[in-house]
Amino acid sequence: MSVAEMFSDFVANLAIGNTETISTRYGELTSALNKQFRDTESKTANTLQVGSFGRKTGINGISDLDMLYIMPKTKWGDYNKAGGQLSLLQDAKEAILKRYPTTKVKVDRLVVTVTYTNFHVEVQPVFEQGDQSYLYPDTKNGGSWKTTKPPAEMTAVADMDVQKNANLRPLCKMA
């Protein structure tokens, strides 16, 4: 076996083995939130898979998953007030508990953490801005809004991977 073949085998062994389960969980979480905030049960609309799974740099055994749930713009006024950040996270938690009543779901400072047997998902409700950035809640010191730009990050990783002959993502998986 050549070095190139051994390297390919090594990289293949890093591939996430439970992507179907992860995708199902993402879909169910999205559906629960869409049902609560939009009166639809779509499993794909209004969500972004972010973090290493979203960038396609995650490895087998990944246990920390991240997703953004894009809130309807019409809800901004409901949450852009004193204590609104915590209320948003609590409302997202309650929506998730309707779908997963026996699953451990808790509000953290910035996210709602949903703990499954082999991994957990950090759900971050966000409000989309015009420049592909998102405002997310921070409950510290009474609450504020912070900015994140995951689409730009994911695009940068994808572009660099193309420039590096599809070697960047495999290298990230080894780090």
Identify the meaning behind each predicted range:
Residues G61-L65, T117-F119:
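A short, glycine/Asx- and small/polar-enriched loop/turn
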Residues M1-I62, K73-Q85:
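N-terminal regions immediately upstream of nucleotidyltransferase
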Residues S23, T30, P101, K106-A175:
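Catalytic cores of NTP-dependent nucleotidyl/adenyl transfer enzymes across multiple folds
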Residues K81, Q85, L89, K164-L171:
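Short, charged, low-complexity patches
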Residues L68-I70:
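Short hydrophobic/aromatic beta-strand micro-patches
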Residues L86-R99:
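A gly/proline- and charged-residue-enriched helix-loop-helix capping module
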Residues R38, L97, P101-T102:
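Residue-level recognition of short, structured coil/turn motifs
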